[in-house]
Amino acid sequence: MNSDLNKLQPYPFERLAALKAGIAAPEHFNAINLAIGEPKHVPPHFIAEELLAHLHGLANYPTTKGSLALRCAIRDWLLMRFKLPANSLDPEQHILPVNGTREALFAFAQCVINRGQPALVLMPNPFYQIYEGAALLAGAEPYFLNTTEATQGLPDFDTVPEAVWQQCQLLYLCSPGNPTGAVIDADTLQKLIRYAEQYDFIIASDECYSEIYFDESNPPMGLLEAAAHAGNTDFKRCIVFHSLSKRSNLPGMRSGFVAGDAEIISAFLQYRTYQGCSMAPYTQAASIKAWGDELHVQENRRLYQQKFTAVVDILSATMDVRLPDASFYLWPKTPVDDAVFTRELFAQYNVNVLPGSYLSRDAHGVNPGHQHIRIALVAPIEECIEAAHRICKLNEQFKK
């Protein structure tokens, strides 16, 4: 058995289940689940039609590389969304479809980490737990970059010691962030690209929340966009991960892509020829339609905007909470230990949220998730509003 498996910590939702074990939630309150970031808005109507229309593809093995039509659709979306130079992306060299970004983010570390020398993988803290597991099982050590109120919910890259950069082989970014919703600006991204060149590491930017934002005239900056603005139109050392799960409310379809540096994409394709699972032909067909349509994405943003406006207005009366730059999470402070608050919210009010400390690690003398909860505004607006009122009631109880 791989001894590195012993380094993995229980997944946050496993810990949440243990926290609630043996507790019977009050039945006079309807259950409201805001713990998991699973979109609940209605998927685009045309997706089911495309899936059904292409079921004949079940008779064929799909290629690891995916169809040229899908890669072209992804190319067109990237050019449009991030205003990239027209000829900067070749669908044959720069793009690789994947079955959702979860497995791709994990597999990527296995592909690029050189086990022959000491390796650090830098990542935000709190963080999407796949980053840590990927680093550990690739034989590397995670190095956590705390995101706190003092750093506006972003990693403070200026405090990273020179010796850490020298051992860095991979930097995971998450922008917009999970759970803070903070967006990394162009200057910072371009500085990190320079660091990647100077210290010889790869940047893996998880941008799965990039299409959930509030200002239609100011969408979040992407890594490839920042690279192109800096003249790095070959996207050297830059890889981005995108998904239809959040953008198009299709978490069950498992469709995303990896794009960027052609040399790295070529190596990742070779790796995935052995390890990865090819995307089903009917999923590819539906994905082409999804990447080609923006109307449903705009409607998605409108629905989240409504929920954020209503919920932040309610919670701000009793909690320290702010509207994030983007994503569908709130990250408020709690008056007591976050696990205690989460347990009592379920026990007394039948509302599920996630303790912030379950998403973070003790690092540099603090746990940045302590006394925070992550609220995923994925439920219908009526449930989100009701949950906000219940959260306020519990908050007031603890403040007495």
For every predicted segment, state its role:
Residues N2-P12, G22-L52, A69, L79, ...:
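PLP-dependent class I/II
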Residues Y61-S67:
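A short, structured active-site edge motif that brings together acidic residues
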